């Protein structure tokens, strides 16, 4: 692969059942009409890729350095790792890394197992979709007062889309913070953080779903965040669902189902943490807007120094095992109490026919077309609250992938 010369429209086939160790870098570019594609062929387990040491290309098993590249149906595993420097974690560490300037790449239908960071992307107009990521529980680095990671998907820049992925078990349980890591992290202050769309993902057992950093970036530049949509995700994690540190402008969290009643061994178990540290005026959080979300919580649906300033519309709040408690922190809420789900304890978040969430959400059809299960959203009339709209029929197949390979 290192010596192969690729051209637009080429397809590189890796045999199923094969294994590769070390680094591969693709520097050539495809075009919009003729992308270069890396895929698998044959029968059996997906082709396996690893790089066991940061001394070789910072531990990257695959680096994309060109435009219009597609990576699909590959398996990445056991990339570094513990005791990695903060600079490498911020800028280079991942099983699969998209370099700055490598734009219009697609990462789809792959597996990432026990990777300290699964995917890192500094490329714009990237699509990361339908991947299965199952992470480790160790910190990438730690001191007596701090630690960092692991992370499933690490975005270094804006203009990216993360959709229909399954992300599980990225996070520590013994960090000085209580726990650290998470499903998706958006930082590296050198590049802008505009136009990010995160939707229809399933996360479970992570130390949080999304974090946007501020003072903790490397280099220590600060990037405010603009024009994000985080919608129709189902999140059953520990730690905070969100940890928003950067000042927000036009940031929307719509129709998510947030289940925070199992800490997964972690000390913190809050919902949305809005702890904005910068901006003018300092800490203003009115650019964050929560609409049509279902919060199932054991501690609090919101926390942080600016959470009360975030805008809230038509959300529902359910205190775990205390359905009679009305949440008092949202005067515009759709309601509080038992949400009427099919089976909360078995993580079946579909609505029963008599669920009070039905018809209580505002219609956002100008932005969205389908719910978490792929059912079309009504063009007119009120919606249901949460990621899954009521439907009498159980979906035939989940849109978010399950693990295909039994090994490792």
What role is predicted for each listed range?
Residues 25, 51-62, 84-99, 113-120, ...:
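Extracellular beta-strand/beta-solenoid scaffold signature
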